[in-house]
């Protein structure tokens, strides 16, 4: 289990309660389903440093942690230095949108516990990301 997986597990404890799900309409995808979905992708995606990945409803990072793990492994030949490889993945390949500020803080702690990376996280509803606000009524 990676450091990020352990941190995610810690953040999930007590967070994914019925009350939280009811109040925030949050339901987290179980890791085994994420693995199953990602297994359907062409294996070459894990060794391509030019690919970008978007999690439009990032939550606590369930998808991102597993994608990060696969990219760290798949990009070894491209970048042998593990620290530079992880930095490239987190700063240039992974992008997140999450509208719950509490979840964003937890996501930052999971992916960047020591604050060393510049993560790409927008605390906003993905469906309105990049739209100009308008006062017009339709």
Where do the protein language model's features map onto the residues?
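SAM-dependent methyltransferase catalytic region
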Residues: 2-138
